[in-house]
Structures are given as structure tokens and as C-alpha cells.
């Protein structure tokens, strides 16, 4: 299928693989929470969407209604490189047509790759009449559970989750990094400073004054990369535990309180306690609860979770979590969304939202105007 616009600009929807090309450099890794609510957006929580930034690459996971506005209110209109859909329920998908069209109206030229379960192609094709003509290339890639999508120094792995429709979770898994270079040992082995040092750090042997020098002679132990896991909508399942084992951050569905466990099971969602139990079994460093309904008080949600797994947070829209390399510290909140510049000045809060605004968001940073 090809949609064409006027003039020279056109789009081809292709079905091959498209890999981003990034320069090799130390990579920051962060998650911006654009939508943390349930199926119905509220004044404080939008529908599902997460923006993962790693180095120079931007990966969007799900694109609920209003995602582009959430971007513009916090980060600006981010030119994402790839979009990953967990499934095609409306609250995870309805923001896509508008985002694609806005990119066109702002004269985007760089290609965009969209990944998702089977049915992605048909769904995007059916939106052609709504979106109209757009002038950049879009690659549509339908994936299966267990696929690994290469990124620089990492891969995004899909895994099956248990929801009411075909659904995936995603794990961003970095490869181990080389150990630290020991220049003193290299000099002692007769390696010249300069290009030979760089060659060794790339993992290639060089000739020293005393004979061949292997990188293992001058490099420390390999350093682990980071793992970030996003479940999308799911009941608790073994596949999530395995994908998240030892992860820096697990972002897990927490749609229901414990008293509604049967409803969670019937609809393919998790209770707060079930999400916490998955995190505990997987031994993750930090659990972030999302898909939280506005009918629950966030304080109650966190109390239930922390009874099972203490390092749990309930991010609000616009919160940003930074994931440093393991040797540099733990995942941490670096920006809190409960800030006046990101709050609509006029909406009337429901009783649940008013309670949330008064009692904080569980991240240790009170909303504006509240006591410490």
C-alpha cells in the first residue's frame, strides 16, 4: 500500500525491517510517563503511553488518545524513531492517527517504524482514509512472541502476556559492556598510547613491544547493561517474571485493587498486589504501577503494593524516571509531573482525583501547595 501526497513528498508503508543508526557513546536511559491511567482518561491521568529515551533514540510504547498533547505539554513534539504496540485496544491505540498526521503537517521526513502483534498492517491500512496523505516512510512490522528487535548495544524482546486479546510485553535489554580499560597495564605490556589503546577498547588485539596483547589482558570484568520491562495490559504471568528477572525497572498493569481480583481475572488485568508479587519474584529493583483507575486512591494502591514489594512507585503523568548504569546507582525520579506548569488550571477534580492531589503520588514529592 502506498499513500501519496501532493508534490514530491510521499509515504510507502513497507513490511521489512528498519534499524536505527546511532553513534557509539555512553547512553542515558529514561522513561517519560505520558499516560498512566486506565481505559478512561481523567483530568490527572491520560490513557496508556510511555516514551523511552536511550542515547539519541526515542521509542514510544503504546499511543493512547491524547498522546501527542501529552508530549507537547512536557517534552515537546518528540520525533520518535519507533512505536511499539502491546495490543490494539482503543485506550492504547487511538492517539496514533493524530500523531501520524501531526508529524506530516510539521513536515517530518525521517522514517518511522511501527511494531505490533498480528493485525497491525490491516489496522493501519484501514486508517488510511482517516489519516490522509502523509509524506514520510512508515515501516509496519508485525512481530511474534520471542522476537528480538536489534538496537545499538541492545535489543527489544517481545514476550506473550495474558490479556483478553493477543498482547505482548516488551523488554529492552542491553548487552553487557566491556570492563574498564587499564592503561597502566597496557603500557607495562608495551602498548603504545594512542590508536592502539582505542583498538584494545574495541575488543581487538594489538602488537605490543613484548608481544601480542589481548583485550582481556587490559580490560576489567564485563559490566552489566540495563533491563527495562513494560507489560502493557496483563494478568500476572510467568512470562513477565522471566522477562523481568533482575530488571532495573518493571512497569506493570495495576488495574484493580485486591477486592476486585475476580474482575481482574475476568478481564485479563492484574491487581496491585499481583503486580507487586511479580516484581518480588522477578527481583526487580523498582516497580512502577500503571493503568491505574481514577476510582482508586493512590495512597491505597501504594499501601497494598508495598505490603508485598516495598520499592514500588505509582508514577503520575509527566513523571520521568532515570535508569543509570548499575554501577552508578539505582533508578530514580528526576522530574515530577505534579507541577503547576503541567497542570490544567481550570478542571474540576472528581473526589478520587482530589484525594490523589491532596495525598501525593507515592513518589516522595508532594504536589504543589501541599505540606511535606
Regions found by a protein language model. Give the residues of each.
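Conserved beta-strand hairpin/beta-sheet module of binuclear metal-dependent hydrolase folds
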Residues: 27-76, 111, 170-172, 179, ...
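Active-site metal-binding motif and surrounding structural segment of the metallo-beta-lactamase
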Residues: 57, 65-115, 137-142
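Metal-dependent catalytic neighborhoods of phosphoester/phosphodiester hydrolases
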Residues: 95-103, 127, 297-306
Amino acid at each position: 500500500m502506498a499513500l501519496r501526497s501532493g508534490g514530491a513528498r510521499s509515504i510507502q508503508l513497507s513490511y521489512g525491517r528498519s534499524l536505527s543508526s546511532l553513534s557509539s557513546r555512553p547512553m542515558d536511559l529514561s522513561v517519560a510517563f505520558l499516560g498512566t491511567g486506565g481505559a478512561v482518561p481523567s483530568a490527572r491521568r491520560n490513557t496508556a503511553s510511555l516514551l523511552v529515551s536511550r542515547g539519541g533514540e526515542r521509542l514510544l510504547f503504546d499511543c493512547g488518545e491524547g498522546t501527542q498533547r501529552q508530549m507537547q505539554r512536557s517534552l515537546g513534539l518528540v520525533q520518535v524513531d519507533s512505536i511499539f504496540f502491546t495490543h490494539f485496544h482503543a485506550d492504547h491505540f487511538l492517539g496514533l492517527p493524530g500523531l501520524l498526521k501531526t508529524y506530516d503537517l510539521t513536515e517530518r521526513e525521517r522514517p518511522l517504524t511501527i511494531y505490533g502483534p498480528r493485525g497491525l498492517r490491516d489496522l493501519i491500512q484501514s486508517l488510511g482514509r482517516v489519516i490522509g496523505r502523509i509524506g514520510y516512510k512508515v515501516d509496519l512490522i508485525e512481530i511474534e512472541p520471542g522476537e528480538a528487535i536489534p538496537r545499538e548495544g541492545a535489543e527489544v524482546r517481545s514476550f506473550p502476556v495474558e490479556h483478553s486479546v493477543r498482547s505482548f510485553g516488551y523488554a529492552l535489554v542491553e548487552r553487557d559492556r566491556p570492563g574498564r580499560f587499564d592503561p597502566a597495564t597496557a603500557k607495562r605490556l608495551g602498548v603504545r598510547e594512542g590508536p592502539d589503546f582505542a583498538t584494545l577498547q574495541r575488543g581487538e588485539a594489538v602488537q605490543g613491544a613484548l608481544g601480542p596483547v589481548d583485550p582481556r589482558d587490559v580490560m576489567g570484568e564485563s559490566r552489566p547493561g540495563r533491563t527495562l520491562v513494560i507489560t502493557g495490559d496483563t494478568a500476572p504471568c510467568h512470562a513477565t517474571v522471566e522477562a523481568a528477572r533482575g530488571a532495573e525497572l518493571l512497569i506493570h498493569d495495576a488495574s484493580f485493587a485486591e477486592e476486585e481480583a475476580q474482575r481482574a481475572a475476568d478481564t485479563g488485568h492484574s491487581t496491585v498486589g499481583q503486580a507487586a508479587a511479580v516484581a518480588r519474584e522477578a527481583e526487580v529493583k523498582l516497580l512502577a504501577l500503571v493503568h491505574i483507575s481514577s476510582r482508586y486512591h493512590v495512597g491505597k494502591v501504594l499501601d497494598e503494593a508495598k505490603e508485598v514489594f516495598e520499592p514500588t512507585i505509582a508514577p503520575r503523568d509527566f513523571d520521568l524516571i532515570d535508569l543509570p548504569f548499575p554501577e552508578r546507582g539505582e533508578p530514580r525520579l528526576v522530574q515530577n509531573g505534579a507541577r503547576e506548569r503541567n497542570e490544567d488550571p481550570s478542571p474540576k477534580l472528581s473526589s478520587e482525583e482530589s484525594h490523589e492531589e491532596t495525598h501525593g503520588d507515592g513518589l516522595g514529592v508532594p504536589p504543589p501547595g501541599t505540606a511535606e
